[in-house]
Amino acid sequence: MRQRDVAALDAKYTKELADAKAENDALRDDVAAGRRRLHIKAVCQSVREATTASGVDNAASPRLADTAERDYFTLRERLVMMQAQLEGAQQYITEQCLK
């Protein structure tokens, strides 16, 4: 009985991890393909054209560096994994060790 409970618990959290990884991979692919945007709070330095008499600033578009974008998705994936592992360990302790 106990072994079956532990196996079910493991299967539940393994599936949740796989689902979270698939969601993160899909989001990464969508951002890379331009189907979705990754919104961050950013400030761009304005570039003033010397010939512009109206005083309108032309701001460069903010964009994450490729390495920063990869790091973001790696961090997101690791946070999801850590959270699922922690929740699984807590549930295991509650259901199996504290009975």
Swiss-Prot record:
Question: Could you tell me which InterPro entries the record lists for this protein?
Answer: I-spanin
What class does this enzyme belong to in the EC scheme?
hydrolase
Give the matching Pfam families: Phage_lysis (PF03245)
Which keywords describe this protein according to UniProt?
A: Antimicrobial, Bacteriolytic enzyme, Hydrolase, Protease
Q: Which domain of life is it from?
A: Bacteria
Transmembrane portions of the chain: none
Q: Name one GO molecular function term.
A: peptidase activity
Question: Would the keyword Hydrolase turn up in this protein's UniProt record?
Answer: yes
Give the UniProt record's GO annotations in the biological process aspect.
Answer: defense response to bacterium; proteolysis; viral release from host cell by cytolysis
EC number, UniProt record: 3.4.-.-
Other known facts: Encoded in the Rac prophage.
> Could you identify this protein by its name?
Putative endopeptidase RzpR
Q: Which organism is it from?
A: Escherichia coli (strain K12)
Q: What is the lineage of its organism?
A: Bacteria, Pseudomonadati, Pseudomonadota, Gammaproteobacteria, Enterobacterales
